[in-house]
Amino acid sequence: MINTNDFKTGQTIKFNNQIYQILEFLHVKPGKGAAFVRTKLRNLRTGSVIDYTFNAGIKVQPALITKIKMQFLYALEDNYIFMNTQNYEQLEINKHQLKDFLKYLYEGLLVDIIFYENDEIVGITLPDKISIKVAYTEPGAKGDTKTNSLKDAALETGLVIKVPLFINIGEKIIINTETGLYLSRDNNK
């Protein structure tokens, strides 16, 4: 059991028959009355975020979460196939479980699959930045590097983002997976 006084950001708990990750917490000791802990929790099954206040000193059950590094191989109808990089076992995940992550998945991408009690898939963690190929964008003209203008670019996954005017079809760019924003050109090609 975890005491609410020992909460840490990123910790996972089982509470009200759900699995939550602690995003934020704040210990509050008012002048009058008992101390309490304000938290912001993300439900790992649904992705929803809630605010909840615990009485200080109560105990909650920890959630056994395991992260396994896997490589995305390919999509097959409504399922996405991943391979464990340690033992080469393959795992099928339905597209509904992947939610907002589909727009970043391309063949060969390494991700962390999050399991609850080693059998239930509750999430996926993408790298903070990924290098991805531009499938289509309007061609840039000479001198386009002098302004901070942006244009639309369709990536190989189908995601459309804003990129600088000097980016061309076939180039690899680095994007932030949290915000979906262009960061830089990928010079490693």
Curated annotation (Swiss-Prot):
It comes from Onion yellows phytoplasma (strain OY-M). Belongs to the elongation factor P family. GO terms for biological process: peptide biosynthetic process. CDD domains: S1_EF-P_repeat_1, S1_EF-P_repeat_2. GO terms for molecular function: translation elongation factor activity. Keywords: Cytoplasm, Elongation factor, Protein biosynthesis. This is Elongation factor P. It is found in: Cytoplasm. GO terms for cellular component: cytoplasm. InterPro entries: Elong-fact-P_C, NA-bd_OB-fold, Rib_uL2_dom2, Transl_elong_fac_P/YeiP, Transl_elong_KOW-like, Transl_elong_P/YeiP_cen, Transl_elong_P/YeiP_CS, Transl_elongation_fac_P. Pfam families: EFP (PF01132), EFP_N (PF08207), Elong-fact-P_C (PF09285).
